[in-house]
Amino acid sequence: MGSEALVHVFLVSFPGQGHVNPLLRLGKRLAAKGLLVTFSTPESIGKQMRKASNITDEPAPVGEGFIRFEFFEDGWDEDEPRRQDLDQYLPQLELIGKDIIPKMIRKNAEMGRPVSCLINNPFIPWVSDVAESLGLPSAMLWVQSCACFCAYYHYYHGLVPFPSEAEPFIDIQLPCMPLLKYDETPSFLYPTTPYPFLRRAILGQYGNLDKPFCILMDTFQELEHEVIEFMSKICPIKTVGPLFKNPKAPNSVRGDFMKADDCLEWLDSKPPQSVVYISFGSVVYLTQKQVDEIAFGLLQSGVSFLWVMKPPHKDAGLELLVLPDGFLEKAGDNGRVVQWSPQEQVLAHPSVACFVTHCGWNSTMESLTSGMPVVAFPQWGDQVTDAVYLVDVFKTGVRMCRGEAENRVITRDEVEKCLLEATVGPKAVEMKQNASKWKAAAEAAFSEGGSSDRNIQAFVDEVRARSVAITGKSTANGVALDLAEKSAEINGKVDLVETKTNGKVELVEA
């Protein structure tokens, strides 16, 4: 890995596709700036990543640094269905993680790779507790919009009124944000949310916000300027997005849980801006009736389409969705249905005209950065808030629905209307122009010297400054005491430093 030691950051991810992808992308950005990055998540996900993305145990060079993987057992059997219940899984993950992560940190130090910083994403705020116990600085990557971060912050601290059981239909006015209707705030905050465990999981991070020295966000300054400026006065925020754009990172270093189908050759055969791309992410599950209506709406519209239909997890207890009889035959070569796709490449393909999306933040950032208009089909969580921004603020989309709170099936006629509005006519032209402007702004942000690039460099510089020397027993790698005891012949104070010749941990006399 080279003769000169690299400052080492250790990333711990919640094992969800929407969490793994942005944190791994951040890891590649940090590695490209000359850091050694270790990415860690439970082995149950590591196994899927190895199979889908050809991940190996060898460090992969990225720019001036390297990225490597260390997965850990979460204490449950591979086919344990309780992983699908966050109320049960999150406490288990915390119990195991608080024990095994320190051991992994110490092992890395013993191997000559002392860790200088821990970084986690939402749902696992206890990682900052682990860092604190080891004397390590920590940071957190927020994987939703800054607008949603602001909403959760104000809800957690009770700073503005939110819908309640007594007043379920009130509007919400948050600082530097548009007025949100009761069903446009992140749905986990609804008083009647069917996902109270997700509300607890997200808000858990806000009880630990005083511990990370930096909150990194997968957004960019120009996209959410006002709310970023406001929240930056409260929290140490650095915008580092869009993370999925990284020209220095090899495509082989990916975090997909499923191997993508080869659909690019089919797209190559289609005229420019003629294909509608449909994907509802890794966790949204539609009803069979809704799938049928989308299918018939596609046929009525006559547009070409690429539709991602991911099968539900085997332990989720959900029925396998099927397409209407004769649907594929009627579509012919006009349509293609796959289980998973290389979304970044699909959105960048000249044949794709628009993106029918659930409006998760990863997909939102990818659509904006690719200059892709959207048809907004949010369901729950931050998706409903993201849809407001895509349609009303960024003006790159049309709205097909308002989310699960509507409690209705979107009809085939509504599907057809939205597809045509987003692909032909003056509205489609306007949306494409706006999307192209955001693409240019995103490219400027992540290019060398752009706002996000500067923030990543500033973060790297701060991590390096914090790791210059680690003194005495309060060592950032958690092993100074063990090493000092083995070096009893050294009198006086013992310092633990990382040398610049071989990256090994050495004890030197103070």
UniProtKB/Swiss-Prot annotation:
Tissues in which the protein is found: Expressed in swelling buds and young leaves.
Record-stated family: Belongs to the UDP-glycosyltransferase family.
Active site, per annotation: H19
Binding sites annotated in the UniProt record for UDP-alpha-D-glucose: Q343, H358, W361, N362, S363, E366, D382, Q383
Signal peptide: none
UniProt: an anthocyanidin binding residues: H19, G381
Catalytic activity from the UniProt record: 3,4,5-trihydroxybenzoate + UDP-alpha-D-glucose = 1-O-galloyl-beta-D-glucose + UDP; vanillate + UDP-alpha-D-glucose = 1-O-(4-hydroxy-3-methoxybenzoyl)-beta-D-glucose + UDP; 3,4-dihydroxybenzoate + UDP-alpha-D-glucose = 1-O-(3,4-dihydroxy-benzoyl)-beta-D-glucose + UDP
UniProt name for this protein: Gallate 1-beta-glucosyltransferase
EC number: 2.4.1.136
Pfam family, one: UDPGT
SUPFAM superfamilies the UniProt entry points to: UDP-Glycosyltransferase/glycogen phosphorylase
InterPro entries noted in UniProt: UDP_glucos_trans, UDP_glycos_trans_CS
Biological role: Glucosyltransferase that catalyzes the formation of 1-O-beta-D-glucose esters with hydroxybenzoic acids as preferred glucosyl acceptors. Has the highest activity with 3,4-dihydroxybenzoate, vanillate and gallate in vitro. Gallate is the predicted native substrate of the enzyme, which thus catalyzes the formation of 1-O-galloyl-beta-D-glucose, the first committed step of gallotannin biosynthesis.
Keywords: Glycosyltransferase, Transferase
GO molecular function terms attached to this record: gallate 1-beta-glucosyltransferase activity; quercetin 3-O-glucosyltransferase activity; quercetin 7-O-glucosyltransferase activity
CDD domains xref list: GT1_Gtf-like
Biological source species: Quercus robur (English oak)
Coiled coil: none
Source organism, top-level taxon: Eukaryota
